[in-house]
Regions:
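Amphipathic, well-packed alpha-helical segments that form the structural scaffold of globular domains
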Residues: 2, 54, 73, 93, ...
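Conserved motor-region signature of P-loop NTPase helicases/translocases
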Residues: 1-30, 148, 153, 157-174, ...
Length: 443
């Protein structure tokens, strides 16, 4: 991007950069501000596929993850089906990104019922953003002058088609590593590089051979495996100095593996004396717990490893575990505050009414119609009189509506806990909310 601006004289406003996470987009923008200045960086479009599609589509009703989960639960309940609502949402996402119903493990009746309920509420989910943006571009109206795509190996079919449409009459730059394509379960395919090469024979390919991440020992161990992938020989030069050898340990079962990891971490952090360390033939370098990471392929393996670590009093933090966000009370609280901030979001209101006040569907529908029509408090009070569930809800609305735009998210959660009681999940929500300036960032 800097080369386009500094060497080629491209105007910043003609540049669009696509990343895969909001964090990556923020880091990219910050680095460009430091190099090119805030004014130049502010004119560029930098964001995820979903963020850019949302900007193109304008003001649309976007369903939150909590509301989508409630909608999936409702779909299964109405159809009398058992199963995981989260698995249903994962299947829906795969279908919307190009997979067949069979491949996604989704019955057509369930698929149709979920989509119908989403449409009834006038809402879109995150995958719909990409599909709608692609439909919007049917006439080639959305084309960026200079499009740059990060982590190209992670894109799925819909995203590939967006890239092709957005760069139809402009320049395209993609960067990625097909050997790091690990999101096949979400529809990603590392062969997208071969596909792009076939569609654009004029493209210029630049191979980055200097590796800044791994020691020579790691590269030497990985090379024989990676070279079996399509694409020929990889000649990577390590930039880092030599380190310890890569060790491979075979365990008879998962439990033995967990026990070994716990003992090994104990040894590395000073859990055995010097004589034992010398007998094992390992260097005596005491590590901090924060120096060590354990990667597992499945959540089930992770739970067993965590159990073994805690048994040996080894402190650990499990990254990526967000079970508390699936808690009914947490989802209800988030949906309630979302409904106050976004009155036009009917799914948020129905989710809050169902989870926090066990409100029947017919009463929730009544409240939704009144709320989305913008009825004032006096009209709402008159309309809900005699309906206990809705009277409780309206009391909470009158109590919290003045504060929702003024208070920080963690203060709102703390206030909720003080008034109505807390739970471990709500405590985690409050601790997480400290890192967010506004509730909208938590959706």
């Amino acid at each position: 991007i800097a080369w386009l601006v500094e060497e080629r004289g491209v105007r910043p406003g003609e540049i669009t950069a696509v990343t895969f996470t909001n964090q990556a987009a923020a880091e990219m923008r910050q680095r460009l501000e430091e190099r090119l200045g805030r004014r130049a960086a502010s004119r560029m479009t930098i964001g995820t596929f979903h963020a850019i599609c949302l900007a193109l589509l304008g003001d649309v009703g976007l369903i939150g993850q909590g509301e989508a989960l409630s909608l999936a639960e409702e779909t299964l309940r109405v159809l009398g089906r058992k199963g995981s609502a989260r698995a249903l949402l994962q299947g829906v996402s795969r279908v919307k990104n190009g997979a067949s119903l069979e491949t996604a493990g989704l019955e057509e009746e369930i698929w149709q019922a979920y989509c119908a309920r989403l449409e009834e509420r006038g809402m879109l989910d995150f995958d719909d953003l990409l599909i709608r943006a692609l439909a919007l571009d049917t006439g080639g109206r959305t084309c960026f002058r200079h499009l740059l795509v990060d982590e190209f190996q992670d894109i799925n079919e819909t995203q590939y088609r967006l890239v092709r449409a957005w760069s139809a009459s402009g320049s395209l730059f993609v960067i990625g590593d097909p050997d790091q394509s690990i999101y096949g379960f979400r529809g990603a395919d590392g062969k997208c590089f071969q596909r792009l090469r076939a569609e654009r024979p004029e493209l210029r390919e630049i191979r980055l051979v200097e590796n800044y991440r791994s020691t020579p020992e790691v590269l030497e161990a990985a090379a024989p495996v990676i070279e079996k992938n399509p694409g020929g020989c990889r000649r990577l030069r390590p930039n880092r100095p030599s380190g310890p050898a890569v060790r491979m340990v075979r365990s008879p079962d998962a439990f033995s593996e967990g026990v070994f990891l716990a003992k090994e971490i104990g040894r590395m952090t000073g859990g055995v004396d010097m004589l034992e360390a010398q007998a094992l033939g390992h260097e005596r370098t005491v590590r901090a717990f924060s120096d060590i990471a354990v990667l597992c392929r499945t959540h089930r393996q992770l739970e067993l490893v965590e159990k073994c670590l805690r048994h040996d009093d080894i402190p650990c933090v499990v990254s990526g575990r967000e079970d508390f966000l699936e808690d009914r009370q947490v989802r209800g609280v988030l949906a309630f505050f979302r409904s106050l901030q976004s009155p036009a979001d009917p799914a948020a209101l129905e989710t809050a009414l169902g989870l926090l006040w066990d409100c029947p569907a017919d009463l929730a529908g009544r409240a939704r119609r009144l709320w989305t029509q913008g009825a004032d408090l006096a009209a709402l009070e008159e309309a809900v009189r005699g309906y206990g569930h809705l009277e409780l809800w309206l009391d909470r609305v009158k109590e919290w509506e003045p504060a929702v735009e003024k208070e920080k998210p963690w203060k709102l959660v703390e206030g909720w806990e003080e008034r109505y009681g807390t739970s471990p999940a709500l405590e985690k929500l409050r601790n997480t909310a400290v890192f967010y300036p506004a509730f909208r960032s938590l959706w």
